[in-house]
């Protein structure tokens, strides 16, 4: 996720000279340098002694956070805001490891950020200034839309809907393509039809002011082919809505478990 956002930032004008990446794994560091032409260091200690960033972005897998986050406590003590895109790590977690006065913005982005079509939900603690909030929002807006939630516990549901959501959409493409194959379409044709249909419908929904339900009704003729399919997909007991309810509930519960 961090790599996707970094590529999105750079492609949308964030200056390479203003970026420092800490990557302890040599192969990954080399790949980033060669691909993105940015400064990649193997440890925070390699930064210039007088270097103080405007924002520290934590894009680390949850299991690696305990070893990494405390190293940035000095920056937090200097008032630098920490922006986390790590799943399952709460604002209080950062307060424990960075200091009680640390300015922290917890976010949940998603992978379409890599192509500038992401959406990020963000939640800030009381130590984040208005200027810092604006700076973080500007950074996040470079890769898509931003919504702020005032209650941190909402991040679990956000994770289930939009953080994990791209995987659901990709699965929909897979399922549509396989169903098309089952009806006799060549695999490559079915895949192209499914991919383009989902991508185009998503863009139509994004640009439209109408609710998704209205857009659905606009392409559904009574007694037609779409209506026949929707009778299956909208069945009360085993249709898409109860299935999605269970999926979102499972992801939300798992997000809470990861947060401890």
Where on the chain are the PLM-derived regions?
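Rossmann-like NAD(P)(H) cofactor-binding subdomain of soluble oxidoreductases
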Residues: 26, 36, 44-122, 126
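Internal alpha-helical scaffold of NAD(P)-dependent oxidoreductase catalytic cores
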Residues: 75, 93-103, 119-157, 168-207, ...
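NAD(P)-dependent Rossmann-like dehydrogenase/reductase catalytic/cofactor-binding core
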Residues: 195-260
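Small-residue helix-packing motif on alpha-helices
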Residues: 19, 29, 47, 186-193, ...
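NAD(P)+-binding Rossmann beta1-loop-alpha1 motif at the extreme N-terminus of oxidoreductases
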Residues: 1-45, 55, 118, 181-183
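Short pre-catalytic strand/loop immediately N-terminal to key active-site residues, enriched for Gly-Thr
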Residues: 105, 154-160, 212-217
């Amino acid at each position: 996720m961090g790599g996707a956002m970094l590529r999105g930032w750079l492609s949308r004008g964030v200056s390479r000279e203003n970026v420092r990446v800490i990557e302890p794994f040599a192969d990954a560091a080399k790949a980033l340098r060669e691909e993105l032409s940015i400064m990649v260091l193997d440890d925070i200690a390699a930064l210039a002694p007088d270097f103080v960033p405007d924002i520290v972005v934590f894009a680390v897998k949850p299991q690696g956070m305990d070893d990494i986050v405390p190293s940035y406590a000095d920056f937090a003590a200097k008032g630098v805001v920490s922006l986390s895109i790590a799943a399952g790590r709460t604002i209080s977690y950062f307060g424990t490891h960075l200091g009680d006065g640390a300015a922290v913005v917890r976010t949940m982005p998603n992978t379409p950020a890599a192509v500038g079509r992401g959406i990020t939900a963000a939640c800030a603690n009381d130590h984040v200034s208005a200027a810092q909030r604006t700076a973080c929002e500007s950074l996040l807006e470079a890769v898509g839309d931003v919504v702020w939630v005032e209650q941190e516990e909402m991040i679990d549901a956000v994770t289930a809907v939009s953080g994990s959501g791209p995987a659901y959409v990709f699965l929909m493409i897979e399922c549509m393509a396989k169903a098309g194959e089952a009806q006799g379409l060549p695999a490559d044709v079915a895949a192209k039809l499914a991919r383009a249909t989902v991508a185009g419908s998503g863009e139509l929904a994004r640009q439209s002011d109408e609710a998704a339900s209205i857009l659905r009704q606009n392409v559904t003729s009574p007694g037609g082919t779409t209506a026949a399919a929707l009778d299956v997909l909208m069945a009360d007991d085993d249709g898409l809505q109860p299935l999605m309810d269970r999926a979102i509930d499972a992801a939300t519960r798992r997000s809470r478990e990861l947060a401890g």
